[in-house]
Amino acid sequence: MARTARRTVPLALVGTLGLGGLVAPQAARAAPRTADPLPAIERAAHPLRSTDPGGSTKDLRPMGRMVGDASVVGLGEATHGSHEFFTMKDRVFRYLVEEKGFTTFAQEVSWTTGLRFDAYVRGGKGDVRELVHKELAKTPWDTKEYVELLTWMRAYNDRHPDRQVRFMGNDLNYPEIGAELFDGVEDYVRAHDPGLLPRITGLYAPIRRLADGDTYMARPLAERKKLAGNAREALDLMKRLQPSAADGEFAVALHHARSVSQTSTIYAFPFDTPEGVKDGMLYRDRLMARNTAWWQRHTGEKVLLSAHNAHVGYESYDPRYPKMQGAFLRDRLGKRYVSIGFTFDRGSLMAQSAESEVWKPRSVGAATRGMNEYTLDKVRHDDYFLDMRTAPATARTWLAKGRLTKSIGTAFPDGPHKIRLAPSHDILVHLHRVTAAHRQSQ
């Protein structure tokens, strides 16, 4: 995306940021003296054998008990560009698939990209490295770690043809609204209500011509609002069809129409104004939660949802964004949604900067006194996790208070930000050191 568009269209930015780069860091303040939480955190901590997938998963069994009967588990990341966050997600997903009956890896990528990845892991043609680069080149996820995840998913499906794992994208369609979405809607209408087809194709025609996200966003706001109206009308017409309750083909076609409408709607927000950014980002988190819940209901299967900590959590650290995807999912699913957040003490990540879209390794020093990670890193285990809902009282009290915490999106430097860990997530994974992810182009 062009630099000017990147500054004036925060949705393309925030689509890969969490909330990083949008909030000014706050000065650290001396905390009042309280009971030392370290012994209580030590008692609650379960050590991790490794952050790499493969090998024994015995150390993850306590996490499995913490997850319980949840149908959707949100698994965050404290940066978008660290190797260990990618590999831990891969490792946890494999465990949840093999031991807890999960089948879907959902990600804050477009519905279009999700369809293409899902086709690949279920035996579709193509080279996985080229596919990932084509779909994710503008995002933090064009990485060798992501390729390895999709490679494992495909290999798993080769071994388990009767219970396959799936990939789902729950976000707006960027960098493009895939032609398969329009085709899916029009093909269904052609087969079931051909008299409606001319109206549907007429409504979609101008949106098809602007399916590329950057081209779309370069159009005047008035035109984008008109196109959003077209997409909403097409969705409303689809909703009026009367298929049988068991018509899975209709459910997918309807979601294609919903996804086109969601994308056209968010492209019609005035992202050159603070209020437009606020309203657009609230809409985005709501739609991601809705799409995830729809998929879980449609498939009847359990879902691991991968996103930044800010998007899988319950609290936002920025008052301009008062409600995030995790909070919307909790509203929809109650205790059937569980949020897992990450912290880390030091290390490196791949990130862009405010001046350049080039991805480079960036270093992050150890946490300083008064930060959440300063205390968390004193636990005797380098890498561990704990259930913040059931930790000893002293630990819960400490975890409930806001302190400066590392939370980094695509733009570096970023933060730290004042975050309350326990109100934000159910389970916390702390890693001593992280390293930069491996982009395919490097």
Task: Give the label of every model feature segment.
Residues M1-A30:
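Secretory targeting and sorting signals
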Residues A5, V9, A31-Q442:
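Structured catalytic-domain cores with a bias toward divalent-metal coordination
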